[in-house]
Amino acid sequence: MQREYDYIIIGAGSAGNVLAARLTEDPGVTVLLLEAGGPDYRLDFRTQMPAALAFPLQGRRYNWAYETEPEPYMDNRRMECGRGKGLGGSSLINGMCYIRGNALDFDHWAKRPGLEDWSYRDVLPYFRKAETRDIGANDYHGGDGPVSVATPKNDNNVLFHAMVEAGVQAGYPRTDDLNGYQQEGFGPMDRTVTPRGRRASTARGYLDMAKPRDGLHIVTHATTDRILFAGKRAIGVHYLVGNSSEGIDAHARREVLVCAGAIASPQLLQRSGVGAPDLLRALDVQLVHDLPGVGQNLQDHLEVYIQYACTKPVSLYPALQWWNQPAIGAEWLFAGTGTGASNQFEAGGFIRTREEFDWPNIQYHFLPVAINYNGSNAVKEHGFQAHVGSMRTPSRGRVHAKSRDPRQHPSILFNYQSTDQDWQEFRDAIRITREIIAQPALDPYRGREISPSADCKTDAELDAFVRSRAETAYHPSCSCAMGTDDMAVVDGQGRVHGMEGLRVIDASIMPRIITGNLNATTIMIAEKIADRMRGRPPLPRSTADYYIAGDAPVRG
């Protein structure tokens, strides 16, 4: 087997697959793509059927199933931290919501020294490059990219339309495209689903077009033990296949690209000798490079479910009954349509809860059934819910390797809800959600409040609900942040500070979490850096306009 390549990519996820596909477009370039999980089995409905999105989170075949340390502000709960395992990474198990973030997220990134070319108008062309939207291209959307994006259709569930209308009746804007000119407001939510109703993971979109190339070698069930160095230069990796304890060395002529995600990327750097000296000494790992920011600055989105009974039989509750599922599965399998062909997150929104925020600080996902994201605690009646959570928490956490063993999970602490702002935002969000649900558009459907219940009113009661019931939105990020400050890990091209031949390219390099779901932005990051690595000029800056609230009131 070949043991030397131009590039070695660690992690076949949302970023790694983009890089594998783009780098091998150049003739003669060789890439080794290592993935600790298995293939993305195309006949496994658990990962391929959009409506089955909860199933991969319930086991360990496709999910690393990380768990946090006891979270001190969350009743000391050990909280779930699911990450994708298999070709596609977290794009193989995520909720398929295609949300890019707010334009001002990127403009604020670009205000940091060294990140000036990460403004919204710089990154929008790369969002477009990656995308094929089912209703065609425009100034904001692409028409010939590897990622299939489906838009909601007018004949979808009536509850989606009612919930958007209720948000507008409550005084918030309406937007026809959460990824277009104006993110702020309520409207339809795009999703990464193919025209045939299949999950559009990066394995399907990018690897499928790259697999026939002679320059790409993919190894699944390959756990990277450590990065190999010659001085300060990364020269390869040592990895294990399957359950074997005997490792394999592979060498990189050009670069090693770490794309293992916001949990595993810092853990791998630490095990390889790149990180804070005190931590490495505790692990008995020889220091290669002192870089204290590795594993710091960890961020996530937290959310709660506000659930209501539905007084008309229009929710998806019947789809949860086993006797209805064979017909749903058959329609999806043979026609690519029906309930199974949607993730059922087809409406949502972004709002500002207070005038002090320059762009939305709260996100909504609307779901026409009452159930936890991971499929647990389904309410046994017709219902609907709003997933609501804050977007740019001031809380910061960390990821620490626990040992040199590559198969041992790291220590993860998000420090959820560690600031007064966190608590105020959730109180505001729950109360505003109740106002929205109380609007006339939902009068025909609104039953009793199931969770947290109408009796939960005071600040103390709302705080107790959040402490005991809030869950991750599965958006860990920022743990190898790009920038130039003392705690930055990489520069604006993903190159690890103080090292040669080593980059980190995934959600961990975001300097600050974005306003929305992470998958689309992670793909964009990889597309943008791939052009730099290939010596290509950046795509021309967009001239598209975008909404800035300015002095506009929170509610119209």
Curated annotation (Swiss-Prot):
Quote a single Gene Ontology cellular component term.
membrane
In which pathway does this enzyme or protein participate? Amine and polyamine biosynthesis; betaine biosynthesis via choline pathway; betaine aldehyde from choline (cytochrome c reductase route): step 1/1
Q: Where is the active site?
A: 475
Q: Which residues bind FAD?
A: 6-35
Q: Which enzyme class, named as a word? A: oxidoreductase
What are this entry's molecular-function GO terms?
Answer: betaine-aldehyde dehydrogenase (NAD+) activity; choline dehydrogenase activity; flavin adenine dinucleotide binding
> Some GO term, biological process aspect, for this entry: which one?
glycine betaine biosynthetic process from choline
Which InterPro entries does the entry link to?
Answer: BetA, FAD/NAD-bd_sf, GMC_OxRdtase, GMC_OxRdtase_N, GMC_OxRtase_C
Asked if the record carries the keyword Glycoprotein, the reply is no
Q: Which cofactor does it need?
A: FAD
Membrane-spanning segments: none
Q: Which UniProt keywords apply?
A: FAD, Flavoprotein, NAD, Oxidoreductase
Reactions it catalyzes: choline + A = betaine aldehyde + AH2; betaine aldehyde + NAD(+) + H2O = glycine betaine + NADH + 2 H(+)
The EC number(s) attached to this protein equal: 1.1.99.1, 1.2.1.8
Instruction: Report the family membership.
Output: Belongs to the GMC oxidoreductase family.
What is this protein's function? Involved in the biosynthesis of the osmoprotectant glycine betaine. Catalyzes the oxidation of choline to betaine aldehyde and betaine aldehyde to glycine betaine at the same rate.
Q: What is this protein called?
A: Oxygen-dependent choline dehydrogenase
* Species this protein is from: Xanthomonas euvesicatoria pv. vesicatoria (strain 85-10)
Q: What is the lineage of its organism?
A: Bacteria, Pseudomonadati, Pseudomonadota, Gammaproteobacteria, Lysobacterales
